[in-house]
Amino acid sequence: MFVGTAPERTEVVSADNVTVQLGGLPVLRGIDLRVHRGEAVALMGGNGSGKSTLVRSLIRLLPYQRGEVRLFGTPLNSFRAWSRIGYVPQRSAPVLRGAKVKEVVASGRLARRKPFLPLRAADRNAISQALDVVDLADRATTEMTTLSGGQQQRVLIARALAGEPELLVLDEPTAGVDLKSQRALADLLAELVGAGASVLVVLHEVGPLRPLLDRAVVLHEGRVISDGPVVPSDESKRLGRHEHDEQRPVSDQPWLGGAVER
């Protein structure tokens, strides 16, 4: 649907010995991670394990103090092709006041357009398609603040999809979303992965996304303690009750529809 290239066994994300401190306290301790083209990888772990910190560090929303990150083979500090990446933040982040659904989704095209120019046919088609995918086409002119939490999350997913990303990074996309919508998301992500896109997703429980996932990387106290097949649901519960990692308002994020503007 969004990506037309065939999967290749090339590294889309590579992180080596990544260390992050926040407020002088260690949050990530020597993280190594690989995500390949056409691969779906879950990040899992208990309270404060560093899942959200890791994904934000990988796309330069948070600085890391040590280590190396490469996106599509390019060192993070030199990476500029942000239109290749879509990012869906945690639903609990406040939404933009006064913004309508279609406006939020349209912002996902900014990295693929020249500033101040009107939407092209390709932009309008991508926006319309993304709204259809999340089943919110009939809410295009609705203000974000009037939507339920699950609907707001679906809008943020549509914004990322509108940019036609090759790498989709999602932070708890199923939190507060009904089972039907979770299954629809799983079907969508499976289609993207089948077309060659890569997915890195933070999850509390795998749920309907289980068949999609190639691997689960489990974090504990800022370290990788497991990297392999997805564990059974009863084993994942052993990781403990989930609380969201560090949160930042959507309005403060230096990205637009998954494209980090630098």
Regions found by a protein language model. Name each.
Residues L168-D171:
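Catalytic Walker B motif of ABC-type/P-loop ATPase nucleotide-binding domains
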Residues E143-L147, Q151:
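Conserved ABC ATPase signature
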Residues G67-A81:
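Conserved ABC transporter NBD signature motif
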Residues A121-R139:
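Conserved ABC ATPase "signature" region
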Residues A216-P229:
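H-loop (His-switch) and adjacent beta-strand-loop-beta switch element
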Residues E164:
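Conserved catalytic motifs of ABC-family nucleotide-binding domains
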Residues L203-H204:
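H-loop/switch region of ABC-family ATPase nucleotide-binding domains
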